[in-house]
UniProtKB/Swiss-Prot annotation:
This is NADH dehydrogenase [ubiquinone] 1 beta subcomplex subunit 10. It comes from the Eukaryota. Its main location: mitochondrion. The keyword RNA-binding does not apply. Belongs to the complex I NDUFB10 subunit family. It is found in: Mitochondrion inner membrane. Accessory subunit of the mitochondrial membrane respiratory chain NADH dehydrogenase (Complex I), that is believed not to be involved in catalysis. Complex I functions in the transfer of electrons from NADH to the respiratory chain. The immediate electron acceptor for the enzyme is believed to be ubiquinone. Keywords: Electron transport, Membrane, Mitochondrion, Mitochondrion inner membrane, Respiratory chain, Transport. One of its GO terms (cellular component) is mitochondrial inner membrane. Residues 1-29 are annotated as: Disordered. It is a peripheral membrane protein. Complex I is composed of about 45 different subunits.
Length: 29
């Protein structure tokens, strides 16, 4: 939630995939 949002505000995470930005969220689900 909020912490991840702050991460995106500061810059994409190291494992951020521009082709599938929600891959990490889906993995948690």
């Amino acid at each position: 939630g909020r912490k991840k949002g702050v991460q995106f505000d500061e810059g994409a995470p190291d494992d951020f995939d521009p082709n599938n930005p929600y891959k990490k969220d889906v993995a948690f689900l």
